[in-house]
């Protein structure tokens, strides 16, 4: 802030917002407000395209690497066992993330970054590939809401290709998303016990996995405040609040929540008026996802719409005078070179050039790696008769619980016991179709990992051989100087 030039209006807003952040933190001790504030306030003179490009590399590499490594330690990662897909109790895997739903939200953000990077190049092929990825993530997460939100965003951004400018209907639909989310977050929970429409609200509550009831549990008088409260001192339940708007209200207070929501309404109006359709689709999908998860205003780093808010906040007319407190340092460090900043793009250009020249050979090595992965899975993986997991991680009833004297209890020989603590810990048996589903998941994961390793090996092999034959081929094809 001290090194960045601002107009008078922007400087006043900065001071007011930082003062508000200090008050919220003092009242709530919620460090997440700093992440929200600095993400928005740090967007002065920052290009969205550049931020999204860097985020795509960082987020993509980290997400893929974490999921791939976690596949080898599935039983030691976070999971849930719920009745889903008509298969009885089945596993929902997070693949290294904090919850299966978060796995799908991570994929939502990755898709948004890819779409923003592709811009007009996002066509049917890219839509089909990302939708296939959506199905793959759903195969492990079994998150209905996550799958639906990703599908809506992919379809909406593909729709833009044929209708780049929205009409009244599309504009109205986009601007209704946030009001509907607020209605279901702050109004419907109070009608669960209203006799006239309670049956209707209960049906909606059932369809959305009791999220309306959960919101009602937190909309109590002890959670109300103007500038936030230390929720850890008043929470009387271990229930998880899967709602960003209610989470923001009980942690940051009424006034900051109103200011944040007004900012989003203003951004929606601006994007609609300026026909920024791609940004509008991504924005409304994340706002919709915020009703199902608390990703918007916590420390999860998944709310990329904060970058939109920051860019919107610092819109200004050209030629307006700006002021900087440390202008001397600003001139001195006007241009900062980041070492190896272009290395990922250069490596990608190398890979693309090699793939175009040796496509057939690389595809053969990829197929061989996929087959080898399946063969290794067949040799190493042994299908158990069932699984015995802690009831804490399931939605099973208490009367279906079992207790094991030891982890190697002979009564459950052939079963795979997970997260065993002691003989007093209630456990749940998972068997039947869930076992077959896990076998399929292991084979699919082995095929994909084998194919990825095969593709990497094929590219490295051909890249090494190609460099020996032609030292300038990569430069000529990729279009940059070595």
Task: Walk through the language-model features, giving the residues of each.
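Membrane-interface alpha helices of multi-pass inner-membrane proteins
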Residues: 17-24, 128-142, 285-290
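Transmembrane alpha-helical segments and their membrane-water interfaces
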Residues: 21-63, 270
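Alpha-helical transmembrane segments of multi-pass inner-membrane proteins
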Residues: 56-74, 98-142, 147-156
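Membrane-interfacial helix-loop-helix modules of multi-pass inner-membrane proteins that assemble, modify
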Residues: 63-100, 202-203, 386-426
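A membrane-periplasm/extracellular boundary helix in multi-pass inner-membrane enzymes
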Residues: 161-202, 381, 385
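TM-adjacent membrane-interface loops and short helices in multi-pass inner/ER membrane proteins
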Residues: 206, 210-240, 248, 254-257
